Structure formats: structure tokens, C-alpha cells
Amino acid sequence: GYATPKELMDDMDQALSLIPGKHKINLHASYAIFEDGEFADRDALEPRHFRKWVEYAKERNMGIDFNPTFFSHEKAAEFTLSSPDEEIRQFWIRHGQACIRISQYFAEELGQSCVMNIWIPDGYKDIPADRLGPRARFKDSLDQILSIPYDRSKVYVCLESKVFGISLESYTVGSSEFCLNYAAKNGIISLMDNGHYHPTEVVSDKISSLLLFNEKIALHVTRPVRWDSDHVVLFDDEIKEIAKEIVRNDALDRVFLATDYFDASINRISAWVVGIRNLQKALLFALLQPNETLKNLQDRSNYSELMVMQEELKFYPFADVWKEFCRQSSVPGGSEWFEQVRAYEKAVLWKRK
């Protein structure tokens, strides 16, 4: 953890100095910054509690995306937006509404849209007696959150599903079917996290279906190891397939991309830099593919030639293009960036209490 918000901001600056391209900050509501002696509970958060984040973003010409935090709170011990306890459910509804207002504040202050993603950890460890009731309450809670006036051209509300989690082995309220149907019916955005599905399912296969029926979709890019473990994103086959699906379907302006991972066993800055650079590498790799040629081979049933081409392309010199992109962005192209992290660790991180 961090002793102060400034420590977090300093580390973000260090990471951003090593990652090429343009980025947005993705904040959780739990990162509110209070003045000395001040506190507001989750249902009473206001834009002013995020003013310092807006100042930080403005100085760096960045936007901010946002997430209500429906966990790590005494009122999230069991259920949140699907709670049978009406007092607790209304508390979390007010939190969601507060976050929409904060998201619009971000969009208006920073001059770019804010993507606000809703995910709740509600579910049952063992076989439930009522599957419909919690989902009906969740549906009503979302209806109430979305009932407040907000500018849908500035705030893009997303809904994220999950197959199961620790202590939710038997039933997750916000399942894929629930979230896809709710988003489609209510004109909000479906968000897919590639760690939130059964291990035999891949998000790369789901993107094309969603693009056919939605103007915009959203992704949390992570790396699941046997379950939703949120390992650091690697330049692996599935990340490349996800990037290819976005690029070859001409959907770069229709897919909101965020990374969602953390590994507390390694240096935080290294984790940020490795994971984000790998997602960028995957997008570059996809942009360099002869996508029309490959599609024509598939349509003409030339499967042998298609396989040969796909395999040969893995050895094409895409790393040269990556290094040029890094050079133009004034960041290290290869692993030499790690020396800067090591120096920062010695000069700054080790001196923190």
C-alpha cells in the first residue's frame, strides 16, 4: 500500500515515463483524497474528493476513467447491490449514483469521456435456494443508479460480469447472461474481463459477436492463471488474438481498453510497465498483420497457406517497429527501462516507511 496519494502519483509518473503512447488514469472510488480530518463514506463521495486527481491528470494532459468500489468496506461483508437488507442495498445504490456524478465531473473538467465500470462481488459459496431474487434486486439497483440525470455522451457506464470467485463458487449474481442482457436492454456498455470466464472460454472469440450488436464495448485485459488471478499481462497468444480481433474488425475507436491486474510479489512499477507495454505490443503486432490477405485465404478455403502465413508472420521483424515507436515517444525500446526502475527503487521506494 501507499502512505500518501503523492507516493502513488510519483510511482505512476515513473511508470508513465517508461511507457510509450497516450494513456488515461483508471481510478477506483476508494482512492478519494480527503483533507486533514475530513472523511466521507462511499455513499457521500463528491467530486471535490477527487479534485487532486483532476489536477494531476490536467498537468499531464490525461483523462480519467472511474470505478465504484463495491468491496473493501464493512457494508460489503456479504452483499451490495443485490443485498436483501434494504438499508445496505440503498447505501450501495447511493454510492453508484455518487460515482456517476464524479464521472461526469471528470469528463467535464478534462474534456474527454469517462468510462465508469460497475462490478460487484455478490454471490453464494454454496448452492442457493433463490437465484432469481438477488438478480432482481441487482436489476432494480442498477435501474435506480442509472435513473439520475447524466450526459451519456460524457459518461459511458459499463457492466462487468464474472463466472465465479473466491467464496462465490456456486453462484454469481452478475453472471455473463445477466450483464449482457441488462446492458443491451438499457443502452449501457458490456465490459468483458478476460479473467472472468471459464478457463475454456476466450474473450477473443466473444469480441466479434458483441461488435455486431453494440456500437461500443469495453475490455479489462488481464492474465488468468487457472482462475481470475490477475497476473501481469504477458505478450501471449490470447492477448495477441484479442488485439487482432479489435484491429482487423476496424474497432479501435469502438473498444474501450483497460488493463486490470496486479501481482503484489513483484515491483509495482515493473508490473505496470510490463503489462501495459505488452498490450501495446499486441496492438502493434495486430496492426502489422496483412489482415485482408489472411481473410481472403480463409474465404477461399486455402487453410494450408493460411496456417503457413500465420506461422511465418510470428517471425517478421515487428520488434523493429516497436523500437521506433518507443524512440518517437522518448522511452526505452528494450529492457534497458528496467535499470531506471531499479535506480528509482533504491533512491525512492526503499526509503519509504
Residue ranges of predicted features:
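Alpha/beta catalytic barrel-like cores
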Residues: 1-84, 91, 100-102, 108, ...
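Acidic/histidine-rich catalytic cores of soluble enzymes
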Residues: 106, 125-238
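Short, hinge-like loop/turn segments at secondary-structure boundaries
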Residues: 83-85, 208-209
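A non-catalytic, amphipathic alpha-helix used as a structural packing/dimerization or gating element
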Residues: 87-98, 140
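Short loop/turn motifs enriched for small/polar and acidic residues
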Residues: 30, 119-123, 160-162, 260-262
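Aromatic- and glycine-enriched pocket-lining scaffold segments that form the walls
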Residues: 113-123, 127
